[in-house]
Amino acid sequence: MSNSRQHQGHFARKRFGQNFLVDHGVIDSIVATIGPVRGQRMVEIGPGLGALTEPLIARVATPESPLHAVELDRDLIGRLQQRFGALLELHAGDALAFDFGSLAAPGHAPSLRIVGNLPYNISSPLLFHLMTFAPVVIDQHFMLQNEVVERMVAEPGTKAFSRLSVMLQYRYVMDKMLDVPPESFQPPPKVDSAIVRMIPYAPHELPDVDPVLLGELVTAAFSQRRKMLRNTLGAYRDTIDFDALGFDLARRAEDVSVAEYVGVAQALARTRNVAQ
């Protein structure tokens, strides 16, 4: 596979994190994993040159219910519009600022499926942005750097377990579905890739916790990974009775389960409500 940044007459732009999927066997496997169904509301993030877009449109789109796509590169937008016409509704702009909820069906039931080969340089911020729209999402299937996927699905007590693990596992059921080697892309990235499936928990399955407080605690806990929690969470010892929670501070952040972090965040919310 050539290392050229040019593919189908388009130069991949580093600032957009562009690596175009070109392996048809991998493309077929990804589409089979997604399992698109005609008439579903689906949006693709970063369609690029349309490698996934074409088979998705063939399975899901109608003129009345097109596939949606969010694309930042205006050169690609023109090509995609010309190629797919009314079967693809393009939204020009940055996925980090896009209101994905605007594509959901009216009402509160999950109705939107989100897919994409996410730009690796913004993957974590984009995953956090997408959490905002989880209540209207059926599922998400993303191509990401393998290292990021490993962190997303990591178990407590492993080196890969991180702030990203806790915050996403609190909101989604996640599974690593496929490995994708660098030679599947043009130009080939310097890292291995993988497909992850993310299914939001239903409202009745979610713990009753303020995600802002949970994020505050988890960020503090992982701020210095090698230090014990009695140091990183020391500022909370005056407001939270860790002993009453059975929460051992003589551990590192990676050794604490998602449920335990949720329990501490709930305790913090109670103390702050009393203080008010």
Swiss-Prot record:
Cysteine disulfide links: none
Pfam family name, one: RrnaAD
Keyword Acetylation recorded: no
EC code: 2.1.1.182
Binding residues annotated for S-adenosyl-L-methionine, in chain numbering: 19, 21, 46, 71, 94, 117
InterPro entries: KsgA/Erm, rRNA_Ade_diMease-like_C, rRNA_Ade_methylase_Trfase_N, rRNA_adenine_dimethylase, SAM-dependent_MTases_sf
GO molecular function, one term: RNA binding
Reactions this protein catalyses: adenosine(1518)/adenosine(1519) in 16S rRNA + 4 S-adenosyl-L-methionine = N(6)-dimethyladenosine(1518)/N(6)-dimethyladenosine(1519) in 16S rRNA + 4 S-adenosyl-L-homocysteine + 4 H(+)
Keywords annotated in UniProt: Cytoplasm, Methyltransferase, RNA-binding, rRNA processing, S-adenosyl-L-methionine, Transferase
GO cellular component, one term: cytosol
Family assignment from sequence similarity: Belongs to the class I-like SAM-binding methyltransferase superfamily. rRNA adenine N(6)-methyltransferase family. RsmA subfamily.
PANTHER family according to UniProt: DIMETHYLADENOSINE TRANSFERASE, DIMETHYLADENOSINE TRANSFERASE-RELATED
Functional note: Specifically dimethylates two adjacent adenosines (A1518 and A1519) in the loop of a conserved hairpin near the 3'-end of 16S rRNA in the 30S particle. May play a critical role in biogenesis of 30S subunits.
Name of the protein described by the UniProt record: Ribosomal RNA small subunit methyltransferase A
Organism of provenance: Burkholderia vietnamiensis (strain G4 / LMG 22486)
Record gene name: rsmA
